[in-house]
Every structure is written in C-alpha cells, then in structure tokens.
Amino acid sequence: NTYDSFGHAMEIYKLVNINNDSIPELYINFGTTAGGDVICTYYDGKVVEQPMWNYGFSYMEGQNIFRDAGGHMDVYHDKIYSIENGQFVLLHEGNYGAADNSHVQFDSDGNPIYDYYWDGTEVSSETEYMNLLNEVYNAQQAITPFDGAEYDSETWRYVGNGLCDYEEIIEAINTY
C-alpha cells in the first residue's frame, strides 16, 4: 500500500460511510497542512483516492455527498463530490478570495473584499455564494471525523469517535 512507507506518528484514520454501500471509505489525515487529507474508496479490487485540504472534510453520512473545504492566504475553495462506480465525481466547485492577495482590500467594517465564483461563474456576493453552496450541501447536517473527538496530549492526537492510529485502523479494516 502506498501509505505503508510513510511515518505514522501524526496520521489519523477513520472508516466513514459516505455512499452507504457495504464497504466503508477510509479517511486519512496526515497531520499537516502540507500533507493534507485523503479519502479512499474501494471498488472493483482497487483503492481509489481523492486528495483534500487538511481538516476540510465533511460528509452527509450515507447520502453519497461530501465536501472538501480549504484554502489559505485569501484563496479558498469548496468542492462537493460524490462517488460513482468507484470514481470521485466533482459535482460543484466554489472559489473565493482576493483578486490580489498581496494587496487585499477591506470594506468599511474591516472585512476583506473577496471575489466569489460558483461552478466557474462569478457571483455577486458572499451571500449568493453561500446560498448556492447550501442548495447542494447542507453543512448544518454534515459531520466530520473529528465530531465528538478530543485531543489527547499524551498521544499528541485526536481520539474518540472512531478515530484510529495506524495499528488501530489496520485492525479495524481486518475485522470489518
């Protein structure tokens, strides 16, 4: 497996149910922004991966829809996916941020002025962007792998809610 060669000290794993089939998806958090996250699905004898932003993954359990939200330095995104025949299908993509992040402009309330795009088309405001996002993805009903988990300062990782270290996820997969 590709990930067996990595160091496992910072990684967090969890089996999640995105598409409500008989095989759970595997969520991996690599513990750093540079490492990001990945969601893996198993189909037709193969593992298929979708890289994501670090800590930006949420999903509607069993409804075959998930979100990758992320970005930095005034460049952000929301990507909405489903899984079809073992492939990750990008359903919608939103992007927002400063036209020039080296010279961010601010409104009278001190908020950054961003440009917003949904599925490649510019939209007029953050409100319109959020309305378009909410039409296809209910973030209020979505869950994340970290819901209900707590940080354990002795192990230096999040624990609870099914989160696993490397050895634990191997056991969880083997006993599934």
Task: Please provide the spans of the model-predicted regions.
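Acidic/hydrophobic-patterned starts of short beta strands in beta-sheet-rich repeat architectures
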Residues: 19-30, 63-68
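Structural motif
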Residues: 33-39, 75-80
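Extracellular C-terminal loop/segment signatures of secreted glycoproteins
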Residues: 36-60
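A short, structured loop/turn motif at beta-sheet edges
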Residues: 17-23, 42-46, 82-88
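Beta-propeller blade termini
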Residues: 9-18, 56-65
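Hydrophobic residues embedded in beta-strands of well-ordered beta-sheets
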Residues: 37, 47, 64-66, 88, ...
